[in-house]
Amino acid sequence: MRLSAGPDAGPSGNSSPWWPLATGAGNTSREAEALGEGNGPPRDVRNEELAKLEIAVLAVTFAVAVLGNSSVLLALHRTPRKTSRMHLFIRHLSLADLAVAFFQVLPQMCWDITYRFRGPDWLCRVVKHLQVFGMFASAYMLVVMTADRYIAVCHPLKTLQQPARRSRLMIAAAWVLSFVLSTPQYFVFSMIEVNNVTKARDCWATFIQPWGSRAYVTWMTGGIFVAPVVILGTCYGFICYNIWCNVRGKTASRQSKGAEQAGVAFQKGFLLAPCVSSVKSISRAKIRTVKMTFVIVTAYIVCWAPFFIIQMWSVWDPMSVWTESENPTITITALLGSLNSCCNPWIYMFFSGHLLQDCVQSFPCCQNMKEKFNKEDTDSMSRRQTFYSNNRSPTNSTGMWKDSPKSSKSIKFIPVST
């Protein structure tokens, strides 16, 4: 992308425009020559092998993200069970991942295919806005989901006070805040001339002040990654502490009650069977959702941390020069971040067994295969039952008993408890 330090400043950027945040500071002389600013002839060049790899990975990422998140939404729609708050958050997080797939991955793949952005200035600004909007929405949906788990675990009484209304307000706030915080893209990016000789135009970033790129990348990194990670870490710190205190208290209470009950039971001559507590069951369900949310947050951090680290390094380290050979590092970190939208659906299905079953049953071909397998299992079970009943029938067993050398008195019928 291009950085402009003033009216006469030349373009600067990586050898290819990429992704929502990249400002591309630090052009080399070879890149300036390619843009028509050096002594050599102007040429539009890029690493074609890297571009083909990026296009292939983006295509696979888009297909897997759309298939996985659409399956989750379809399964949630068809599930006969009562929709819980967690299902509501999963639905909107899947919608946010679909926004990343359609508004970030798909436009970037088309852009890489054409090399230069093909469209008017307003479309350039809209595409850049929607690319960052998906990233904000995915991050903030994780924040509100974790906040809901924090309230459920640490303040369970508040979950009885209109929980559905509070959850919907949190989700609506996440969507609105994501849309508002991504609007600076309209003022940063535009269609500008990137080649002084060929007059080639592209959708690049423009900054009036030299420190504009640092402020922009720092703001986006803080809003999309640092602030959400700090909030997520704080919430999970309180959640883990509360669960630890809860488990320790239950263990001590169970041991004291067990000792008292064992003494009374020993005196009366019988043993009391332990009863199952409903509080314990609810706690296990909450812990399972907390584990699922923790895995989703971990996947988000692992996928996006390299991208934001590279971006911050490129604008804050004065000694960093992103040469053409180092561009694969930027591309690979960006592709790793886009894979996050593919991971979440499988995490949902792993922690929700019925969700995977409902997802499989949503496809007609899978339903036909399931009915076929069920029919085969039923026929096989019927044949086994028929064979067993024939061998145990009175007509066959009478003849065998008569021919037996042993006396019938030796046969003892032992009652079987049912």
Swiss-Prot record:
Membrane topology: Multi-pass membrane protein
The entry's keywords: Cell membrane, Disulfide bond, G-protein coupled receptor, Glycoprotein, Lipoprotein, Membrane, Palmitate, Phosphoprotein, Receptor, Transducer, Transmembrane, Transmembrane helix
GO biological process, one term: positive regulation of glutamate secretion
Record PTM Phosphoserine, positions in chain: 404
Annotated lipid attachment (S-palmitoyl cysteine): 365-366
Subcellular location: Cell membrane
Name of the protein: Vasopressin V1a receptor
Organism from which the protein derives: Homo sapiens (Human)
Taxonomic classification: Eukaryota, Metazoa, Chordata, Craniata, Vertebrata
